């Protein structure tokens, strides 16, 4: 895994930008593919399961740690 991937499966995150900004969710996995907000470019990112919602693909810089115990700026 590269330095872009700071979260692992099950980590609680909040989406900080894009269509789903402000939505909490859980990381399902790290991916390298097109995302919902950047469909024309392949990027490192995550599949995030939105609480009571869909699974979305977001870039690595569109999520932030929800738990205080996780380092957000590594």
Model-predicted regions and their roles:
Residues 15-19, 50-52:
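Short acidic, glycine-rich loop/turn motifs
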Residues 22-36:
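Short beta-strand-centered aromatic/proline hotspots
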Residues 1, 37-42:
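Polybasic, low-complexity nucleic-acid-binding and compaction segments
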Residues 44-74:
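Intrinsically disordered, low-complexity, charged/polar segments
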Residues 8-9, 40-44:
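A short, compositionally biased
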Residues 1-16, 34, 72-73:
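Mixed-charge, Lys/Arg-rich low-complexity intrinsically disordered regions
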């Amino acid at each position: 895994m590269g330095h872009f991937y700071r979260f692992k499966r099950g980590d609680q995150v909040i989406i900080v930008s894009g269509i789903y900004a402000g939505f909490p969710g859980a990381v399902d996995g790290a991916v390298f593919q097109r995302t919902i907000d950047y469909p024309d470019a392949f990027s490192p990112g995550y599949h995030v399961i939105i609480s009571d919602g869909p699974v979305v693909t977001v870039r690595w810089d569109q999520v932030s740690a929800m738990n205080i115990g996780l380092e957000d700026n590594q």
